[in-house]
Swiss-Prot record:
ATP 2 binds at G1068, S1069, S1070, G1071, C1072, G1073, K1074, S1075. The lineage of its organism: Eukaryota, Metazoa, Chordata, Craniata, Vertebrata. Glycans are attached at N74, N89, N92, N97, N295, N807. It holds the Pfam family ABC_tran. The keyword Phosphoprotein applies. This is Multidrug resistance protein 2. It is found in: Membrane. It catalyses: ATP + H2O + xenobioticSide 1 = ADP + phosphate + xenobioticSide 2. Residues 635-657 are annotated as: Disordered. It is a multi-pass membrane protein.
Length: 1276
């Protein structure tokens, strides 16, 4: 309750007040975990019933051992009495006859006791099943709810919350931390109550059977309890720190994998590995400290336990010799207290797992409890029957939550009449996109009012508000599904006819119909299978299908080529009819027909009016237009025939999509996409169909830690041997009382044996500490190394591997988080436990064969049944672990996609759809969990019950052997305690089955990825590294299809050449293969036929790292990393330490220095996840600075200035022109004014070069290029 009250009290606090921590918050920070009952906050009545029944069953199961000890004590007295009567009385016939009577009586008594054992065993068979299966069922049901609640809570947060939280950590928590909660609230709690019940029942039996001896032993118990409590407290603290470090590492991995093209292009793999390794190192150090602390406590606990044995037998002997207690009473008390104290040892691992779960639940429940100030799921707020679309911004002030010190809007006033189109113009970062975000209520203004039809939008229902708004953003986000489904995200229940209509309006219909699966084509992660222009057109169709009252176009045509833009612009003009529209555009030709054009400067509007009015005012707008117009003036020549050019233009429009090629576009896996979707389960099954790794295979992963493992195994063997040694000492004490020695001799012998117990305790203290420390350290080193090596192997793969839908960011981060942890789970403390149990049982059997082979053979016959049940459990759980892993990867993909693209999800009001998809993806893991509960319950109960049945067989047969003078009772007890306690330990080893099963699956994945050598190996040291690069590039008859879409040709015999220092411009319609040329030069892929040459050498012969080091790239949609601006720019050259002077020089050249200097933290300002804290233009300029700092020999500019405003573009274009001097440069641009000065312009169509020449030469040809220029010029 304390946890829940704490968070409800803080729910209404602004999450932005991150810097100010109250004392209460500081206290929370020091002890961040959830209350015990708070862990079960999502249990319904059925879950509670399962938990209550499971707990009752666990309590009954726990009482079975102490109950057994009562039977055992009475049985021991019968044995002792009979043996004392049998062995000395063998002198004459009458005494022999008397012995036979006693022997017969002993066998009858033992038969009765055997029935008691069997009855208890039958009870255990039932209650152990209920205990395990019911707790697993309750956990499975609650975890399903927690996953859904947590995902709902993430979907419910406002954008400002995401600005100050690491998205990568959220995905790690959704997979890793929820799994920890699952471990903590399942069968381990049943085991906990079982151990508690055993402890309490054992002491009750002890007091009833002999209160004096029990009190003496109890004197040691508080010390054992105190050490356990201290251990649990320290463990919780270390666990939370470890989780935080792994969450940070997971965030780094996700960020890197999501931006893999950027990382590979700039050779950033080693830098990212270092960044990842830094967080892993922190987690490893905490984990080692945790292992040391834990095992000191365990060592102390065993020392105290053995000290209590010594005390018990020393005092017990005096009680027997004084005839106060019988031997049976002493043993009943001793064994009851023994099992009671052992149960404390069993409590400790369960407390550890529960402590881990409480630490993991803290952050998860904290997010679930966080109530956003803008609640997109709220049903409150006004829902007007009709919306006219009158908009007003009144004295609006705003700062972004993550940079509250920087004011973006400083008193914005703007009115938009219903049906009007208002264009917002101004330089990058002046607040245009912010205005659009405030209208969608992604943020609330810090001051002022935004209203629709005179009503403050804060009083309107959030979902209703967003549903009446259609948005097309500067960098459109598509989801990893089909084209039709992506458009359907615009509006639920939309018909196929409406989808086709919207697609035609967005000029996307033709290219879609050319694809093999048309509307059922998969677009890939973030739409990666399509070109920028194709993505943009689908995004426009998605907005149009919404039929919105208000249309927001934020650079909606920025990624389109000239021809497509003309048609789409016409479609948008048509779509704007009758709608209130706000347009943001740097290309001013697209806004000249707006009813009102508003000029932004310094966070306020400084001028308003239509195109003609503002041109007369000679203000900001006029200046921008003049700059752009001058840039677009082209010498068309007096012979330019307008009608002819129109004809060619119209031909081009229809020709444009005759090419089946699609650019990055055509990339990867549209072919067969529908079949992929249908056959996903089959393909994934094949993917997973790798031979499961053997135990030795898993051990090999840890082989570099062999010194730790050797010491750990030796200590585990010693600890395992302690139980058989205990059996020898224990049976020796029994023998003292069955022999007819004088009391003094008996006391001396018992004192000696008690001293042995004390020595064993001291040995255990040392060996348990070293066992835990060495295995703990080896486990942490293994986890760190495996995570590092898997991540390294991922970064080694070529781009085609990442194109595969099975290797999405979500799937890879899920594997990265879970695989290493699963292997560690089987190799650290689990391996220690297995080694200990094998040594225990093995040594026990050997000793038992020496002292009583007949009884040993009977027990060895029973043992395979126990082992068989463990093997069955492992096999079934192994299959379940594989299924769980695969299915949770599916849900991980959905969650990652939704969280990474949260702004788009919110704008489209599709939070509920993603929740439904996520909930649906959890159904199979959920059903598997329920099935696994029953299987685990059956195998566990059988294993536990077999112990009791073995007691019955052992003592029944033992009675026969004693009665027939084949064995002494002392030896029966030795064999019994050595073999049966060893078998109990082996039975407990079956609880390792789920961990070992998971480890086998995970190890197979790890080994497979580590052994996978890509065809283009980024880490390879092979290949030529010429001393000098001139920069001559030649493509000779290059044929290329993307690996995941082999049936769609992209380049069909492309040949082109650019000489050293020349600038080559590639033009053509969207999807014609322009960006493919750049990707082949970067060696993201290799051509299927033909050759790419660099300075006359085939690039396949060149060292990949060397090649990429000489290339600088600026992409159409630049990706920045969540670090400082300086670090992002320095990322351009990862081969050295880039100085601050170089960073600033590159920033000045890219026209971003002045903006950076205006920020409070200047170059140390963090840019946010994927650069979300910056405008599109600002991101682009930082990306340009990043490329320039590289000082490349060859510069690749793929729409490098597409996101810039006119003013910035002019300056940056000059910077790029200057940067091109002395360098070979390949430019891709839709804005033809930016490439007029190129040495060579190549027009690509159908994957081939159709025209080439200079600007003037191509104009003179009056071909495709001429018509494109004409179309662009006509619109100015």
């Amino acid at each position: 309750m304390e946890f829940e009250e704490d968070f409800s009290a803080r729910a209404d606090k602004d999450f932005l007040k991150m810097g100010r921590k109250s004392k209460k918050e500081k206290k929370e920070k020091e002890n961040p975990n959830v209350g015990i009952f708070g862990m079960f906050r999502y249990a319904d009545w059925l879950d509670k019933l399962y938990m209550v029944l499971g707990t009752l069953a666990a309590v009954l199961h726990g009482t079975s051992l102490p109950l057994l000890m009562l039977v055992f004590g009475n049985m021991t007295d019968s044995f002792t009495k009979a043996e004392t009567s049998i062995w000395p009385n063998m002198t004459n016939q009458s005494e022999i006859n008397n012995t036979e009577v006693i022997s017969g009586s002993l066998e009858e008594d033992m038969a009765t006791y055997a029935y008691y054992y069997t009855g208890i065993g039958a009870g255990v068979l039932i209650v152990a099943y209920i205990q395990v299966s019911f707790w697993c069922l309750a956990a499975g049901r609650q975890i399903n709810k927690i996953r859904q609640k947590f995902f709902h809570a993430i979907m419910n947060q406002e954008i400002g919350w995401f600005d100050v939280h690491d998205i990568g950590e959220l995905n790690t928590r959704l997979t890793d931390d929820v799994s920890k909660i699952n471990d903590g609230i399942g069968d381990k709690i049943g085991m906990f109550f079982q151990s508690i019940a055993t402890f309490l029942a054992a002491f009750i039996v002890g007091f009833i059977s002999g209160w004096k001896l029990t009190l003496v032993i109890l004197a040691v118990s508080p010390l054992i309890g105190l050490s356990s409590a201290m251990w649990a407290k320290v463990l919780t603290s270390f666990t939370n720190k470890e989780l935080q470090a792994y969450a940070k590492a997971g965030a780094v991995a996700e960020e890197v994998l999501a931006a893999i093209r950027t990382v590979i292009a700039f050779g950033g793999q080693n830098k990212e590995l270092e960044r990842y390794n830094k967080n892993l190192e922190e987690a490893k150090n905490v984990g080692i400290k945790k292992a040391v602390t834990a095992n000191i406590s365990i060592g102390i606990a065993y020392l105290l336990v053995y000290a209590s044995y010594a005390l018990a037998f020393w005092y017990g002997t005096s009680l027997v010799l004084s005839n106060e207690y019988s031997v049976g009473q002493v043993l009943t008390v001793f064994f009851s207290i023994l099992f009671g104290t052992f149960s404390i040892g069993h409590i400790a691992p369960n407390i550890e797992v529960f402590a881990n779960a409480r630490g993991a639940a803290y952050e998860i429940f904290k997010i679930i409890d966080n109530e956003p100030s803008i609640d997109s799921f709220s049903t409150q707020g006004h829902k007007p029957d009709s919306v006219m679309g009158n908009l007003e911004f009144k004295n609006v002030h705003f700062s972004y939550p993550s940079r509250s010190g920087i004011k973006i809007l400083k008193g914005l006033n703007l009115k938009v009449q219903s049906g009007q189109t208002v264009a917002l113009v101004g330089k990058s970062g002046c607040g245009k996109s912010t205005t659009v975000q405030l209208l969608q209520r992604l943020y609330d203004p810090t001051e002022g009012v935004v209203s629709i039809d005179g009503q403050d939008i804060r009083t309107i229902n959030v979902r209703y508000l967003r549903e009446i708004i259609g948005v097309v953003s500067q960098e459109p986000v598509l989801f990893a599904t089909t084209i039709a489904e992506n458009i359907r995200y615009g509006r639920e229940n939309v018909t196929m006819d409406e989808i086709e209509k919207a697609v035609k309006e967005a000029n996307a219909y033709d290219f879609i119909m050319k694809l093999p699966h048309k509307f059922d084509t998969l677009v890939g992660e973030r739409g990666a299978q399509l070109s920028g222009g194709q993505k943009q057109r689908i995004a426009i169709a998605r907005a149009l299908v919404r039929n919105p009252k208000i249309l927001l176009l934020d650079e909606a045509t920025s990624a389109l080529d000239t021809e497509s833009e003309a048609v789409v612009q016409a479609a948008l003009d048509k779509a704007r009819e009758g709608r209130t529209t706000i347009v943001i555009a740097h290309r001013l030709s697209t806004v000249r027909n707006a009813d009102v054009i508003a000029g932004f400067d310094g966070g306020v509007i400084v001028e308003q009016g239509n195109h003609e009015e503002l041109m007369k005012e000679k203000g900001i707008y006029c200046r921008l237009v003049m700059m752009q117009t001058r840039g677009n003036e082209v010498e068309l020549g007096s012979e330019a025939d307008g009608s002819q050019s129109d004809t060619i233009a119209s031909e081009l429009t229809s020709e444009e999509f005759k090419s089946p090629s699609v650019r990055k576009s055509t990339c990867r896996s549209i072919c067969g996409s529908q079949d992929q979707e249908r056959r996903v389960s089959v393909k994934e099954a094949q993917d997973e169909d790798v031979p499961l790794v053997s135990f030795w295979g898993i051990l090999k992963l840890n082989i570099t830690e062999w010194p730790y493992l050797v010491v750990g195994v030796l200590c585990a063997v010693i600890n395992g041997c302690m139980q058989p040694v205990f059996s020898i000492v224990f049976s020796g004490i029994i023998g003292v009382f069955t022999r007819d020695d004088d009391p003094k001799t008996k006391q001396q012998n018992c004192n000696l044996f008690s001293l042995f117990f004390l020595v064993m305790g001291m040995i255990c203290f040392v060996t348990y500490f070293f066992q835990g420390f060495t295995f703990g350290k080896a486990g942490e080193i293994l986890t760190k190394r495996l995570r590092y090596m898997v991540f390294k192997s991922m970064l080694r793969q070529d781009i085609s591997w990442f194109d595969d839908h099975r290797n999405s960011t979500g799937a890879l981060t899920t594997r990265l988080a879970s695989d290493a942890a699963n292997v560690k789970g089987a190799m650290s403390s689990r391996l220690a436990g297995i080694t200990q149990n094998v040594a225990n049982l093995g040594t026990g059997i050997i000793i038992s064969l020496v002292y009583g082979w007949q009884l040993t053979l009977l027990l060895v016959v029973i043992a395979p049944l126990i082992i068989l049940s463990g093997m069955m459990e492992m096999k079934v759980l192994s299959g379940q672990a594989l299924k769980d892993k695969k299915e949770l990867e599916v849900s991980g993909k959905i969650a990652t996609e939704a969280i990474e693209n949260f702004r788009t999800v919110v704008s489209l009001t599709r939070e509920q759809k993603f929740e439904n998809m996520y909930a649906q993806s959890l159904q199979i893991p959920y059903r598997n969990a329920l099935k696994k509960a029953h299987v685990f319950g059956i195998t566990f109960s059988f294993t536990q019950a077999m112990m009791y049945f073995s007691y019955a067989a052992c003592f029944r047969f033992g009675a026969y052997l004693v009665a027939h003078q084949i064995m002494t009772f002392e030896n029966v007890m030795l064999v019994f305690s050595a073999v049966v306690f060893g078998a109990i330990a082996a039975g407990n080893a079956s609880s390792f089955a789920p961990d070992y099963a998971k480890a086998k699956v995970s190890a197979s994945h790890i080994i497979r990825i580590m052994e996978k050598i890509p065809s283009i190996d980024s880490y390879s040291t092979r290949g030529l590294k010429p001393n000098w690069l001139e920069g001559n590039v030649k493509f000779n008859e290059v044929v290329f299809n993307y690996p995941t879409r082999p049936d769609i040709p992209v380049l069909q015999g492309l040949s082109l050449e650019v000489k050293k220092g020349q600038t080559l411009a590639l033009v053509g319609s969207s999807g014609c293969g322009k960006s493919t040329v750049v990707q082949l030069l970067e060696r993201f892929y290799d051509p299927m036929a033909g050759t790419v040459f660099l300075d006359g050498k085939e690039i396949k012969q060149l060292n990949v790292q060397w090649l990429r080091a000489h290339l600088g790239i600026v992409s159409q949609e630049p990706i920045l990393f969540d670090c400082s601006i300086a670090e992002n720019i320095a990322y351009g050259d990862n081969s050295r330490v880039v100085s601050q002077d170089e960073i600033e020089r590159a920033a000045k050249e890219a026209n971003i220095h002045q903006f950076i200097e205006s920020l409070p933290d200047k170059y140390n300002t963090r840019v946010g996840d994927k650069g979300t804290q910056l405008s599109g233009g600002q991101k682009q300029r930082i990306a340009i600075a990043r490329a320039l700092v590289r000082q490349p020999h060859i510069l690749l500019l793929d729409e490098a200035t597409s996101a810039l405003d006119t003013e910035s573009e002019k300056v940056v274009q000059e910077a790029l022109d200057k940067a091109r001097e002395g360098r070979t440069c390949i430019v891709i641009a839709h804005r033809l004014s930016t490439i007029q000065n190129a040495d060579l312009i190549v027009v690509i169509q159908n994957g081939k070069v159709k025209e080439h020449g200079t600007h003037q030469q191509l104009l003179a040809q009056k071909g495709i290029y001429f018509s494109m220029v004409q179309a662009g010029a006509k619109r100015l």
